[in-house]
Amino acid sequence: MNTTATQTVHADRLPDVDTDVAIIGAGPVGLMIANILGLQGVRVTVVEKLDQLIDYPRAIGLDDEALRVFQAIGLADTLLPHTTPDHWMRFVTKDGHCFASIEPRTDEFGWSRRNAFIQPLADRVLFEGLQRFEHVQVLFGHGVEAFTQDGHGVSVEVTTSAGRRRTIRAAYMVGADGGNSIVRRALQVPFEGRTKPNQWIVVDVRNDPVGSPHIYMHCDHERPYVSAALPHGIRRFEFMVMPGETEEELSKPENMAALIRKVVADPDKVDYIRKRVYTHNARLASTFRVDRVLLAGDAAHIMPVWQGQGYNSGIRDANNLGWKLAMVAKGLADGRLLDTYTAERRAHARSMIHLSEVAGDIFAPNTRFGVRFRDAFVRSFNVLPAVKRYFIEMRFKPMPRYEEGVVLLPPPQHRGGWLARMLERAGNSAPGRLLGLMSEKRESFLGRLVYGKDPLAGSPVGRMFIQPRVRTADDRLALLDDAIGNGFAVIGWGTNPTFGLTPQARALAEKAGMRFVLAKPDVQLRHGDDVPDGVIAIGDASGRLKEWFSRLPQSVVLLRPDRFVAGVCSPQQVSEAITELAGKLGMTEVPPYAEASTPSKTSRPVLDPVTVTQAAGA
C-alpha cells in the first residue's frame, strides 16, 4: 500500500492519479471497501481530508455479521484481541435492579452476536490490512473540492493540507465521508429524517473505575445514563444533556464530577480520555447511487447509537457494494449491477434506523406517557415469557432480507392495506415505532396481520447463509467461509453440484470464479469416490448444514460473495440457476460451449478523456 500525505513536485500541483475506484473517507466503511477491492486486484485510491486516522473511540458495538466481513478479508484474527465477545446489554432501574437483559447466545454466522470493541484499533487493523496491496493507496491530508462525472468515469479535484492540488480520475467513486458528506451534498441527494431533541455527553475513561462487564442502560427518569465496559480497561459513560445545559458547562470539573459520582465513588481519580456531546439523528438518503458515484456508511444513513448499528450498517454496505464494484471494475459485469446496491441495502438501513429509535424510546422516553408505556411494556415480561424471550434473544432485530436485486425470486409483491398505512402515519410516536418495527418481520403474527401472508416468508433466498464449523478434506475444523473461500459458491447437500452441468453454465461459473462444494455428513468425508475433480468436499461436523437443508425441498444453494443466498434449486436445475444468476449480475456474455478463462486480477478498464456532464462543488 502507498500512503501519501503530500509530495513536493510543483509549487501548486501534485501528480494526477489514475485509479479504478476512488473512495472518499478513510473511516471504517471506506477502509473496508478498499480491503474488499484490494483482494480482488482492483486499483483503489482512498482520499482522506485529515492527516491521520481518527484516534478516539466512537462506536463500541460490533455484531456477528460485521465480524464475518472482517473474516472474509482475512483480518478477523487481528481484530479479535480488541473485542469482548458476548457483550450483553442490561436495562436497569434507578436503584440498579436489572429488569431486562439482551443476551443472544446463538452463533448462526460463526461469531458472537454482540461484541464490544475499540473502534480506533479496528480502524487501524483495516488500514494496516491495506499494506498487502501495492495497487491500493491512501492519500491523507487531501480534501475534496469538486468532482465531475461522465459516461466513462469520475474526476475528483482535491487539495492537500499544504494547499497543493491534484486530480484523481476513477471509473467509480464511493462517498464514505460521514454524516456531513460533501459527496452527498454535492449530488443534492435528499437526506430526510429527524433529529432527536436531547443531546448526550459521552465520556471515555482509562483504567476502568467500575470493572463490571457488559453494558448497562440506567433508566433514571431524572437523567438516563449508560455505563459500558470496553476492551483494554476502557469504560464509556453517556449522560443525557438536560434542557438548558451546554457541553462547556457539563465539562467543568465540578459538574463532570457530579455526573460521574452516579457511578464512581471517587470521581477525582478518574483517568479521562475525552468528553464530547452528541446529537442523535435518524436520516436516510433517498438513493445510494447517482450514476458513477455511490454513497456508503454514514453518508447514506445515520441512526441513534442505542443498538450499535450505525457502524455495523456501514460494514453491511461495504459487504454488499464491494464485490459488485469489483465485478464491474474488472469488466465481469454490467454497470447496472450497481443499481442493486440501493435496492438491497436501503430498506434494511431504514429498518435499523427504526430499531435504533425504538431502543432509544425504551431507554429514554421523551414524555411521561412514554415512561409509563415503557414501564408497562417491561412489566409484561413477568407474565408473558414469550415477549421476554423475543426481547432477550434479539428476535426483534430486523435481519437483511433481499426481495429484489441479485436474487432468484419472482418480483416482490408490495402488500399492506389500511393497517400498514396507519402504522406508517404513527411512526413519529414511540408505540407506533415499536409496532412498526415488530411488523417488519413479515413472518411474525403482527407482520402477517399488517401485510398479509408472505408466500416467501420461509424462503432462505435473499438472507445470509449460516456459517457452521465444517471438516475439510485434510481433517481440519474450520468455519465454512474459510473452508470454501470467498467468491460465489454452489453447495450441494449429498450431491455433486457439477453433475450434468452444461458447457455454457460451466463457462459462466468459471468466469465468475464460482466454486462448487459437496457437503455431506462428517463420517462420510473419508470416502472420496463421490467427489470429482474441482469440487470441494466438506464434512458437516455440527449437523447444522443437514438441519438447514432439511427445511427445504431443494438440496443445492447458490451463494454470493457476501454470503447471501442468491438462490436454491434441485441438482438437475443447477445449470439453469447459474444462467439466471449470470443474467441478474449483468455478466458479459460467454458464447455457448466456449472455453472460459478466468480474467486477470490486474485487468483495468480503459478511461476515455474527461467530458464533463455533471459538476458538483464542495
UniProtKB/Swiss-Prot annotation:
It is an enzyme of class 1 (oxidoreductase). Pathway: Aromatic compound metabolism; 3-phenylpropanoate degradation. Its EC number is 1.14.13.127. The gene is mhpA. GO terms for biological process: 3-(3-hydroxy)phenylpropionate catabolic process; 3-phenylpropionate catabolic process. The keyword NAD applies. HAMAP family: MhpA. The keyword Secreted does not apply. InterPro entries: 3-HPP/3HCI_hydroxylase (IPR023786), FAD-bd (IPR002938), FAD/NAD-bd_sf (IPR036188), PheA/TfdB_FAD_monoxygenase (IPR050631). SUPFAM superfamilies: FAD/NAD(P)-binding domain (SSF51905). This is 3-(3-hydroxy-phenyl)propionate/3-hydroxycinnamic acid hydroxylase.
